Amino acid sequence: VEMDGDEMTRILWKMIKEHLLNPFIELNTDYYDLGLEHRNETNDQVTFDSAEATKKYKVAVKCATITPNAARMPEYNLKEMWKSPNGTIRAILDGTVFRAPIVVKGIEPCVKNWKKPITIARHAYGDVYKNTEIKVPGPGKVELVYTGDDGTQIKELVHKYDGPGVAQGIHNLCGSIESFARSCFNYALDTKQDLWFATKDTISKKYDHTFKDIFQEIFDAEYKEKFDEAGIEYFYTLIDDAVARVMKSEGGYIWACKNYDGDVM
């Protein structure tokens, strides 16, 4: 699947195909134009179509795309402020983004004690990238409400506002977290590297703690013996402790992060 992009990436990708690919191979791709203008013309349907095609064919090349902000609205005469194509595609694929640095002699890392690559494993679903936000106009309360199919409700007060503010709702799925955990454990076994996982479960006692619990349950039930045989380990710690440990380490491991944490890292 070929996903074209915006601005200079369109020119560079065209040159890559003309000079490096087409002269040597028969390039048979399913093409989708994810340029902002075409996304606007199709009401962003092209983004969803490209993701579904990727699920079908199992491999894709995506060029860089513009995620519009308020300034882009008049510039491109947009119908609405379309969401991030990357976020949409990741949510549909429900995958894990593995970012492994390329180590090159002569290019020294900023942290001198880093000797081996540190691979970031980023959950590709949910969190702030599938959020719902509101601007609170004035005094009142914001509540989090779950309504089951049988009509039962769970209600939690988010905040009692004395004046204007903002509120945000995020979510995740246990099935997606389980897929994320297994992909991280399998990648660690394939590459024979230790796996770290970090959240802030001491503060987020239900959301983040669910991530921690699912990882541990799957590790104990499915991967502990395999890790022991491979001579590697799974290690959990708080996200702030993980950052400190990373700065002191030599590298050579996989660091699994929730969606936003992985984006930052």
Where are the language model's segments positioned?
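Short, ordered loop/turn segments at secondary-structure junctions
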Residues: 5-6, 34, 65-66, 200-202, ...
